[in-house]
């Protein structure tokens, strides 16, 4: 293969590889925060048949805000999520293994929209801020240890 072809073909393969792993299966605006790890998203330009979805962040667990396990830490986690996500646009990497959890919520890793492209991993941000713990639920495609080191 001539060097000029290699120079053209190599970047093309790199772009394809990057696109395959891009966390932009869905994009939308967060319309409601339920608790630290659950919120509603109004989708834009998605391949999903739903316009408004409820999202449960993959492989993390925030303290509870309701019921017998409700605590101040749960309220703090909810406030953190609300301050970062409410009325903002995010990108979602949706679970390709099962899609939804037992409560009909889409399981996803969320990324902040930074300049119109996927930016910081919000699941990781919650853990790093001390508002969530990693829980590697094996019924989804994600490996939290790959993004939380």
Language-model features: where?
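Small beta-barrel nucleic-acid-binding modules, primarily SNase/OB-fold domains
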Residues: 5-11, 15-149
């Amino acid at each position: 293969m001539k060097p000029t072809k290699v120079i053209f073909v190599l970047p093309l393969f790199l772009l394809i590889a990057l696109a395959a792993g891009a966390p932009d299966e869905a994009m939308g605006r967060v319309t409601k925060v339920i608790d630290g790890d659950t919120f509603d998203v109004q989708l834009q330009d998605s391949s999903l048949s739903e316009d408004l979805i409820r999202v449960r962040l993959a492989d993390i667990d925030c303290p509870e805000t309701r019921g017998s396990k409700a605590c101040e830490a749960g309220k703090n986690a909810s406030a953190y999520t609300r301050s970062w996500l409410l009325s903002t646009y995010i990108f979602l990497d949706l679970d390709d293994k099962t899609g939804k959890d037992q409560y009909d919520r889409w399981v996803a890793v969320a990324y902040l929209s930074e300049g119109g492209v996927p930016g910081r991993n919000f699941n990781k941000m919650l853990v790093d801020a001390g508002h969530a713990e990693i829980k590697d639920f094996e019924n989804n495609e994600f490996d939290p240890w790959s993004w939380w080191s």
